[in-house]
From Swiss-Prot:
It is a multi-pass membrane protein. Keywords: Cell membrane, Heme biosynthesis, Membrane, Transferase, Transmembrane, Transmembrane helix. One of its GO terms (cellular component) is plasma membrane. GO terms for molecular function: protoheme IX farnesyltransferase activity. Its main location: membrane. This is Protoheme IX farnesyltransferase. It catalyses: heme b + (2E,6E)-farnesyl diphosphate + H2O = Fe(II)-heme o + diphosphate. It comes from Thermofilum pendens (strain DSM 2475 / Hrk 5). It comes from the Archaea. The chain crosses the membrane at residues 40-60, 87-107, 108-128, 135-157, 162-184, 204-224, 228-248, 261-281. Converts heme B (protoheme IX) to heme O by substitution of the vinyl group on carbon 2 of heme B porphyrin ring with a hydroxyethyl farnesyl side group.
Length: 282
């Protein structure tokens, strides 16, 4: 039986994919000045399919981990609603189409998509995720590739501004994952995945999240100094990030590590979407 559309969307983590696509589209709009509709559509298609295909491969490789975790055991592969073969075929088709669309835009968009796949699958998922509590620091660079690709689609190259946007998403990825894995630390221990909060404890997860939040703020400030976002846009986007820091500090004092980390997780997601939207609007 062919996988359902719902299961395919879940395989590709469509909400997460959409958030990363927003970073790429906004990076394109910021860099283009006068956007070309055809280039925007083709670049968006390239980014969406490349991210989706990469995510699908990640789900195949992590199916055993997902089976062991309460949070993820109902995903299509561990729940056996989709075979690994079907998942690989769907992911391969999406990735190939995404990279082909990238070539049609320009070589830099293709390279960004390919690097995203290689970093996420080879470096993060295969080499580091099951071995190092610092895996997300390296894996986060995969999440930054759509922003870099979007900038490259607009400008014909990477450039320091494109690299800054990529770094912002990369550093934010550590914050995103550490806040979430602090809340679900017991799940990660059960699955044998050495996420930082699972190895060093929830308090360490909050401390690491605070350090990552400071790093995110600094990179965002550099983006402001580089002229990528206005002072008003930067100030407005920083509000949920500052609130997340306040929540994490409160958790550090009160000992409510898991609860405050989860609240901060929601706030930092708002920050990321807001920053990139304001990048364009301001």
């Amino acid at each position: 039986m062919a996988p359902s559309a719902k299961d395919l969307l879940e395989l590709f983590k469509v909400k997460q994919t959409a958030l990363l696509l927003v970073t790429g589209v906004c990076a394109y709009l910021e860099g283009a000045g006068k956007p070309d509709p055809a280039t925007l559509v083709l670049a968006s298609l390239s980014m969406f399919l490349s991210i989706a295909g990469t995510t699908g491969f990640n789900m195949v490789l992590d199916a055993d981990i997902d089976s062991a975790m309460f949070r993820t055991r109902n995903r299509p592969l561990p729940a056996r609603r989709m075979s690994a073969k079907d998942a690989v075929l769907a992911s391969s088709a999406a990735l190939a189409a995404g990279l082909a669309a990238g070539v049609a835009v320009n070589p830099y968009v293709f390279v960004a998509g390919l690097l995203g796949f290689l970093i996420d699958i080879a470096v993060y998922t295969v080499l580091l995720k099951r071995k190092s509590p610092w895996s997300v620091v390296f894996g986060g660079f995969a999440g930054g590739m759509p922003a870099l690709g979007g900038w490259a689609a607009a400008t014909g190259g990477f450039g320091y501004q494109g690299v800054l946007l990529m770094l912002l998403v990369a550093v934010w990825s550590s914050l995103h994952i550490w806040t979430l894995s602090t809340y679900y630390s017991e799940d990660y221990r059960r699955a044998g995945v050495p996420m930082l909060p699972a190895v060093y404890g929830e308090r360490a997860g909050v401390v690491a999240s605070l350090a990552a939040a400071v790093a995110v703020f600094l990179v965002a400030f550099l983006a402001f100094r580089a002229g990528l976002i206005s002072a008003v846009g930067f100030a407005v986007a920083a509000v949920p990030l500052v609130l997340a820091v306040a929540v994490l500090l409160k958790g550090l004092v009160s000992g409510e590590y898991r609860e405050k980390a989860y609240r901060a997780f929601k706030l930092v997601n708002i920050f990321m979407g807001l920053f990139f939207v304001l990048l364009v609007l301001t």
